[in-house]
Regions:
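SAM-dependent methyltransferases
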Residues: 1-3, 160-161
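RNase III-family endoribonuclease catalytic core
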Residues: 2-114, 118, 123
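Short Gly/Pro-enriched turn/cap motifs at secondary-structure boundaries
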Residues: 34, 143-144
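Short acidic capping loops at alpha-helix termini that bridge into adjacent secondary structure
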Residues: 126-129
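Pyridoxal 5′-phosphate
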Residues: 132-136
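Mobile acidic interaction elements
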Residues: 139-141
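C-terminal edge-of-domain segments
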Residues: 145-161
Length: 161
């Protein structure tokens, strides 16, 4: 059996007034933020699910249930750091991560380098092993209408000897 595992995660949240917009651990200037029990950072939530899934640890709902008041307004970074510790405890190392944020607005290109650095810090990874991309749906669907933001993440783990 190979010592490598791949995980995929997805998350989406509605944009609402009165909240900060957090994406990949970075505050993004926008009049609306993502709705959620925590900070709503769908990029980090997708990445956490990818990490946990690859390590055979389930998903965020198992480890950080929204019904648990401990996670009310928790930062995505705190979830990611905890997920990384679980992956490490299972004997895996993170080789690389790849996150795609799907949003019609705001333009995310000015934030990509900060997002890569923030995720790298949480995971103790060099920035060149962290990819963050931004895509739009060119007006199609809920993200295209500006109703929300979604993210997809993929990770590669290797088993330590």
């Amino acid at each position: 059996m190979s010592g490598c595992r791949v995980g995929t995660g997805f998350d989406a949240h509605r944009l609402v007034p009165g909240r900060k917009l957090m994406l990949a651990g970075v505050e993004v200037a926008h009049p609306r933020g993502l709705e959620g029990h925590s900070d709503g950072d769908c990029a980090i939530h997708a990445l956490c699910d990818a990490l946990l899934g690859a390590a055979g640890e389930g998903d965020m709902g198992r480890h950080f249930p929204s019904a648990d008041p401990r996670w009310k307004d928790a930062s995505g970074a705190s979830f990611l750091e905890r997920a990384a510790r679980l992956v490490d405890a299972r004997g895996f190392s993170v080789e690389n991560v790849d996150v795609t944020v799907i949003a019609q607005e705001p333009a995310l290109a000015p934030y990509i380098d900060k997002m890569r650095a923030a995720l790298g810090r949480c995971l103790a990874l060099e920035t060149e092993r962290v990819s963050v991309k931004a895509k739009s749906t060119d007006g199609l669907g809920a993200t295209g209408r500006g109703e929300g933001i979604a993210a997809i993440a993929t990770v590669l783990l290797s088993k330590r000897e």
